[in-house]
């Protein structure tokens, strides 16, 4: 099985909250695709609660588009990580990490303005696979944590696992 990009960085040294360019690629037509690691929590130390991250997934996707789309950028998808320490965001374009961080913080401020769980988009059995697993309160606690802290930048070169360590860890 090939080693995925996300497993070549040392999770014990990741800062959070922080933005990291996880991957860049070009489509056959020449479009730039960038995948960002939006790390909300320090891996293996903190974790977002499942109801909160699920609600945040519903809110974050729209709010982030409001703040980041335009000027050569269009978000394709924002999805939570299985480890519940962050989200991956795939987009067309190459915005710098600071622009992403500012948009992320603005999106979290928008989450804090939602006043009623019934205002969560697609919160129904037809559009959500687990529509009763939500918590606006938990989502807002996560958002408040981001608003209250500076968003750093994680650099791949600083986090790269050495080749000998990768060989040692490879099964």
From Swiss-Prot:
Residues given in the record as Fe cation binding sites: 54, 58, 128
Pfam family, one: LuxS
Keywords: Autoinducer synthesis, Iron, Lyase, Metal-binding, Quorum sensing
Listed Gene3D superfamilies: S-ribosylhomocysteinase (LuxS)
GO terms, molecular function: iron ion binding; S-ribosylhomocysteine lyase activity
Keyword Metal-binding: yes
Cofactors: Fe cation
Family under the similarity heading: Belongs to the LuxS family.
PANTHER family (alphabetical): S-RIBOSYLHOMOCYSTEINE LYASE
Complex and partners: Homodimer.
Protein name from the UniProt record: S-ribosylhomocysteine lyase
Upper lineage: Bacteria, Pseudomonadati, Pseudomonadota, Gammaproteobacteria, Enterobacterales
Gene: luxS
């Amino acid at each position: 099985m090939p080693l995925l990009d996300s497993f070549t960085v040392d999770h014990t040294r990741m800062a959070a909250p922080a933005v990291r360019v996880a991957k860049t690629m070009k489509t056959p037509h020449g479009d730039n695709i960038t995948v960002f690691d939006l790390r909300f929590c320090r891996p293996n130390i903190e974790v977002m609660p499942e109801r909160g991250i699920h609600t945040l997934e519903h809110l974050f996707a729209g709010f982030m588009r409001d703040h980041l789309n335009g000027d050569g950028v269009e978000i394709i998808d924002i999805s939570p990580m299985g480890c519940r320490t962050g989200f991956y965001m795939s987009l067309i374009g190459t915005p710098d990490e600071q622009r992403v961080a500012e948009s992320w913080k603005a999106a979290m401020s928008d989450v804090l303005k939602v006043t009623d769980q019934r205002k969560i988009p697609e919160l129904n059995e037809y559009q959500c696979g687990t529509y009763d697993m939500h918590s606006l309160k938990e989502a807002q606690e996560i958002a408040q944590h981001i608003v209250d802290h500076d968003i750093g930048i994680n650099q791949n070169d600083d986090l790269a696992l050495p080749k000998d360590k990768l060989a040692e860890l490879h099964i």
